[in-house]
Regions:
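His/Asp/Glu-rich metal-coordinating catalytic cores
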Residues: 1-17, 22-214
Length: 214
């Protein structure tokens, strides 16, 4: 694991807010806490559950503060607002920071799936309102953001899976990122619909993500 140097004088980090629970956003948290154990970790329920599981691997029990999309928290000099976004992991948020110096909007990772399986849309109305109020710095994370158009909706894979489950003569082997709960949910639903047995060979993080989302 390679992480940036975070040991500047006195480790001046006052709190850490994670927009979602993917490894590239939470993987360095235990190393940060080893420098300064009292840093409060802020995030949604699912995100913090994954953060706590990550910290448990390092025998660290963090101090956490749970937020939901729409919440506004005062974190030091920053008024911090959390906005719902859709992503390939549940419970993702964007973060808006307001201070006397200006306003920063950080989207975190997001996609514009208009028919998400979990019903959680990227809240463009909320983002538009923030834009109308004035944003001094807009920081957006999204793979292939420079390509025009939309990401194919997650529901598009449903008919493909259904066709395979309906016509299977042997076993179906499915691999998935542990955190992609919606992607795991689809084959489980078709397995039940067609009364097929299932054998799950979970990796470490698949077990933790599944337990967290249950």
């Amino acid at each position: 694991l390679t992480i940036p140097a975070i040991c500047w004088p006195s480790c001046r980090v006052a709190s850490s807010a994670s927009p979602h629970g993917h490894e590239d956003h939470i993987g360095a948290v235990p190393y940060l806490l080893k420098l300064k154990p009292d840093i409060p970790l802020i995030g949604t329920t699912f995100t913090l559950a994954l953060v706590e599981a990550k910290c448990e691997e390092h025998k660290i029990k963090p101090f956490t503060h749970t937020i939901e999309a729409g919440d506004i928290e005062q974190l030091g000099p920053f008024e911090t607002e959390f906005i719902a976004v859709n992503h390939s992991i549940p419970d993702s948020v964007a973060v808006c920071l307001r201070s006397a110096a200006g306003t920063v909007l950080h989207t975190g990772d997001f996609k514009l799936d208009q028919t998400p399986l979990d019903g959680r849309l990227t809240d463009l109305r909320h983002i538009g309102r923030l834009g109308a109020e004035g944003v001094d710095l807009f920081m957006a994370d999204s793979t292939n953001a420079d390509r025009p158009g939309f990401t194919a909706p997650e529901r598009d894979i449903g008919p493909v899976l259904e066709r395979h489950f309906a016509n299977v003569a042997g076993k179906i082997v499915i691999a998935s990122f542990a955190s992609h709960v919606d992607r795991i949910q689809l084959p489980m639903a078709f397995r039940a619909a067609f009364s097929l047995p299932v054998e799950a060979r979970e990796g470490n993080w698949l077990m933790k993500a599944g337990a967290t989302s249950a």
